[in-house]
Regions:
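Short glycine-aspartate micro-motif
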Residues: 3-5, 61, 71, 110-113
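Acyltransferase
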Residues: 183-236
């Protein structure tokens, strides 16, 4: 089964082509540039380099969020368009799970972190069991301090991954102490090949109803934060 994996949910642009579990080719850049101008050319270049025609693809896998609203939307739109035009299945995979997958050899919990501003993060909790990535706590948007207090109750150490971890390292260590392990650079970037493997057995989405998973705040909470920002602005 030839799978094309697409990840534009962070400023990492990743495209991978796999034949089952076997990686054929992979394209990754960590540039803060517009994915809308670069994603399709990257896909075209990868397919040509690997001498694979679009008609030979069996499945599309896309990082469905959370992450950059614009970035996630670009990837999902491209993936839906390709899947529809080629009449092949599309599977969406958590962008956080894709980052967690890079830490497959860590024996305990994995918490990928995307910054959501004002002390908040997008995160979830994962671990590997018999080589398979398992979701322990679903992806969510919450205050990092609250998340760390929640993790403090766990019986194992937690590996924090993702490029935004360094923005929050001080809070993580302050709350969790030695239970927190800050990942090395090798586990911070999402790899589209990991995304593709995660999506191999993922269920197919309904192309008409499939939308990005932005993990928006509950309306009441969002309004409260907006009101607080207004108060800060008047007194700033």
């Amino acid at each position: 089964m030839k799978v094309l994996a697409i990840d534009t949910s962070t400023y990492t642009l990743g495209v991978a082509l796999l034949d089952g579990e076997q990686l054929i080719g992979e394209y990754i850049t960590d540039l803060k540039k517009n994915h809308s101008l670069r994603a399709m050319p990257a896909i075209d270049a990868l397919l040509k380099e690997c001498e694979v025609q679009p008609s030979e693809l069996d499945k599309i896998v896309v990082a469905k969020g959370p992450g950059s609203y614009t970035g996630v939307r670009i990837g999902v739109t491209i993936a839906k368009t390709l899947a529809w035009s080629l009449q092949i299945p599309l599977s969406g995979v958590s962008s956080l799970a894709t980052v967690a997958a890079s830490a497959r050899y860590f024996p305990a919990y994995i918490s990928p972190i995307f910054d959501a501003r004002r002390g908040r993060v997008y995160t979830g909790l994962y671990r590997f069991e018999n080589g398979e990535l398992i979701t322990v706590k679903e992806d969510q948007n919450l205050l990092l301090e609250d998340w760390c207090k929640e993790l403090k109750e766990l019986d194992h150490s937690v590996l924090f991954t993702g490029k935004d971890v360094l923005l929050h390292k001080e809070t993580i260590i302050e709350v969790l102490g030695e239970k927190a392990i800050i990942g090395e650079a090798s586990v911070h970037s999402p790899r589209p090949s990991d995304l593709g493997r995660l999506g191999l057995t993922a269920p197919a989405e309904d192309l008409h109803s499939f939308v990005p998973n932005y993990i928006r705040l509950a309306e009441a909470e969002a309004k409260w934060i907006e009101a607080q920002q207004g108060v800060e602005g008047r007194h700033g």
